[in-house]
Amino acid sequence: MPIEPSDASESAATPDELLARRAAAVTIRPVRFDDLDNILALIEPFVERDVLLPRSEGELIELLPSSFVAEDAGRLVGYVGLEIYSIKLAEVRSLAVAIDHQRLGIGQRLVQACVDLARRKGIIEVMAITSKEDFFRLCGFDFTLPGEKKALFIHTTQS
């Protein structure tokens, strides 16, 4: 059976080239209202594994103006929200990338979309509360607070 030209180029490509092509096909865009059901479905497995906190549809609607999705051939494969607290501070929230699309740089592109939005809005700092420290360091985040200060939290409700 003769090899089709597209098959030949695929077989000649290195694994890194194939990953780069796959990643390049993914687009990052602002969230639309009609994405909400797909976002909830995307983040649900991460919530079930306690990787992400649960988000209601209402919470996602509030984040709508400052949220982004990653889309691959019409399929939603990533989500991130930027919660803007003030001109001083915003937080990256609910970053999720479909398992079969991880390690393609999609998460970094989603985080960068949030950082770019914060810059355009003049927000001074963007934070991330995460268990994936290494990932956020790759995105340019660090642990520094002025002086020897640390961020401390107290729960005001029972969960």
Residue positions per predicted region:
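Conserved N-terminal entry element of GNAT/NAT acetyltransferase domains
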Residues: 1-33
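A short, internal acetyl-CoA/4′-phosphopantetheine-binding micro-motif in the GNAT/acyltransferase core
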Residues: 95-102
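Conserved active-site alpha-helix within GNAT-family acetyltransferase domains
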Residues: 120, 124, 130-150
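Conserved acetyl-CoA-binding loop-helix of GNAT-fold acetyltransferases
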Residues: 103-116
